[in-house]
Amino acid sequence: MAQLNTNFINHIEKELPAHLSLQEFIAYCDKPLRKSIRVNTLKISTAQFVHIMTSAGWQLSPVPWCADGFWIEGKDDIQLGNAIEHIQGLFYIQEASSMLPPTALFSNDNTAEIVLDVASAPGSKATQIAALMNNSGLLVANEYSASRVKVLHANVLRMGASHTALTHFDGRVYGEYLYESFDAILLDAPCGGEGTVRKDPLALKHWDIDDVTAIGETQKDLIESAFLALKPGGILVYSTCTLSQLENQHICYHLQQTYPDAVEFESLAELFDGADKACTEEGFLHVWPQIYDSEGFFVAKIRKKASVERVKKQPKLQKNFPFNPANEKQKAELTQYFYDSFCLELPSDDVIMLRDDEYWLFPAQFMPFIGKMRFQRIGIKLADAMKKGYKAKHEAVIALSAATHNPAKTMELSAAQAQDFLMGRDIATSTFDQPTQQQLAIMPQGEMLVSYHKVVLGVVKHLGHRLKNNLPRDLVRDNVNLYL
């Protein structure tokens, strides 16, 4: 049962719109959240995913503001995180309300090419943005917490998002280092978390108005910095999972007062059918738990009408960038290796970079950012150069195969075989049906891909009697659940 202290209840009663009931708000705070997921369209179409999972008995109810989002009903026993389909990146476990900010960012046919997600971890919104961008352009995903950067990176790789650059900074530096560099920015700000009580009953046990006021000051700094980093004409979406106006409307008002000639609020009243139920006079979405039976959330869409004066001068460019472009011979050899080994093609508009014996693939849009700030991870690691030839990296075949969908040199696994593969086991060729065994018998031995649901799981080495598992040790799972 949610523990709402008296101070919070008294505070929220004043904030609650007149047409909503405090008693209903308290009742919804005690209701468990519905499970929700988002289909990863970088790897599978929503229609195909729905067909596969409804055949397995999943009951999916669409989230109205996200074409790829669904609530799962009637399957209380589902351990979503251990499902094969989750491990292979076909879906992300994401609270329905948190799908709103990326949807707002790309509403009205926004075709932003260079995007910043200021506070990205664990990666739900960042990977949603990557899917909306269809792995094109550049997504800079930042996270202040060092431990959470690792989680963010793991989720970016699992979902096959390749046009990303990860950073580890306080979000307040972007206006200084990358002034007016982004077409669109999502600032899902750190907040008091008042909307999360349905999944954390103790979230508001020690609520205090002084804490709300204090975090509001940080939010003001963050939104100012994000606005400075936004190009004129660009879109900034400010969002939180909290309910107090001090952390929501008042932060947007602060930005408007700071840059009165450059800030324009764009209405989200028509973002989806029923959005008007949560829409404020300014056009913000203030989502109370009882409106859509979801977490509490706030979303504002802000357009930058004009350039604004930067606060600080551009810092000096950083030296000693450890990567260099591959030469034409190296690019040709690596391209041929991926095609001969896996029937995978390297994107011609991306840039192959070299660091020692490591080959990387950078988004072309990243190149102007070199030297402007330190990046934790850029693009994807393609392969290591060996004494003879190359050794492909798992993240490369996952990302590249997502673009070509089940390339020719791939062996489809059964559910049981896929389970074994993800648990680090080799696959005996005798476990395939007779036609497939005959096919394997005439195939040349060596590296090849394995897939499930026609989506690549990883690399194996065909040794004749078995397919040797090359899954990286840190990705091997102890528990993999089958639902088909």
UniProtKB/Swiss-Prot annotation:
Subcellular location per the Swiss-Prot or TrEMBL entry: Cytoplasm
Q: Which PROSITE patterns match?
A: SAM_MT_RSMB_NOP (PS51686)
- Enumerate the GO terms in the molecular function aspect: RNA binding; rRNA (cytosine-C5-)-methyltransferase activity
**GO BP term, pick one:** rRNA base methylation
Q: What class of enzyme is it?
A: transferase
Q: Which reaction is this enzyme known to catalyze?
A: cytidine(1407) in 16S rRNA + S-adenosyl-L-methionine = 5-methylcytidine(1407) in 16S rRNA + S-adenosyl-L-homocysteine + H(+)
Q: What does the entry list under GO cellular component?
A: cytoplasm
Q: Which UniProt keywords apply?
A: Cytoplasm, Methyltransferase, RNA-binding, rRNA processing, S-adenosyl-L-methionine, Transferase
What family does the Swiss-Prot or TrEMBL record give for this protein? Belongs to the class I-like SAM-binding methyltransferase superfamily. RsmB/NOP family.
State its role.
Specifically methylates the cytosine at position 1407 (m5C1407) of 16S rRNA.
Q: Which HAMAP family match?
A: 16SrRNA_methyltr_F (MF_01579)
For this entry, the protein name equals: Ribosomal RNA small subunit methyltransferase F
Q: Which organism is it from?
A: Shewanella frigidimarina (strain NCIMB 400)
